[in-house]
Amino acid sequence: AKKKKKKSIKKIKKKKVSKKKKSIKKTKKKKVSKKKKSIKKTKKKKASKKKKSIKKTKKKKASKKKKSIKNTKKKKTEKQSSGGKIFKVSTAWSKNALIDKKGYEKKYNESVKNNEAFWSEEGKRIDWIKPYSKIKDITYSKEKVDIKWFYDGTLNVSYNCIDRHLPHKANDTAIIFEGDEPSVDSKITYQELKDEVCKLANGLKEIGVKKGDRVTIYMPMVPQAVYSMLACARIGAVHSVVFGGFSADSLAGRIIDCKSEFVITADQGVRGAKAIPLKNTTDEALQKCPDVKKCVVLKHTGADIAMKDERDVWYHDITSNASTDCEPEEMNAEDPLFILYTSGSTGKPKVCF
């Protein structure tokens, strides 16, 4: 009985010790697990905060950098445009301005509230051969977009640019020309402009240019380029100006696309110390343009160039003895004035008509 009692006490003690050990082990495990979780959470929070802080710092830095770049550009522009100074408009100058801010806002509001009446009045600012009675006809639909302005009126752009100024401004400067060289410059009066434009207009008519014909202008930056545009407008021909730096292929493409039968160019252009072979480029382009009837050539530098019989004519030959009077052609307000092509840097050049 004693032995049994001892064994029973021993077992109970063992069980108690085992339970105690297990309980201690569990408690330790729980504590360690909680500690680990707490450390993990703390680390996560710290990492998240750090990330957010880095992100914010980067954003702030990027924003500051952008602002700094913008401000630097602004300052550079201001310096370039005004030599480092900002010139405020004087009160005397503001008083003589054609329109002030209030006047502009008033006009704008009128144009929105009563659009047709507003443009009816604005249209009177230019001279009409036959005054308009209809202001606009606009259609917006999936099938058709059609926009017409002053479409029953007739006028001439060349007349509006030159002749209407002659009664009071004949001897005033119409064009200030600055050549490639600082010493090459001139001031052209309205009367001189009218005479030169009319002489060229008559010369163009003499070689067969008529109302509706397309004329390509491939010229250097000289007054004759302006005379050419205005002469075309005077006789109702549609002009297409092509930049004098374009290649023969680019020139040919534009001549063909606008169905031009006449070209006005020069022997050469000048850019700095470099001579631009305009006539040579034109000759190369015209090999692909069999429909071109005449090519008018301005003797600008006096360079030795080839002249093709029956097709090429000198600018001075068709203008020197021509009359300084040329009646402006009556044109409908919706008739085309000029064709201009985009550079074609993103594909085929687009047409502005």
List where the protein language model places each region.
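Short, contiguous pre-domain boundary segments
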Residues: 82-106
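Conserved pre-ATP/AMP-binding loop-to-beta segment of ANL
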Residues: 171-173, 295-297, 308-341, 348
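Conserved AMP-binding/adenylate-forming core of the ANL superfamily
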Residues: 109, 158, 175-229, 247-252, ...
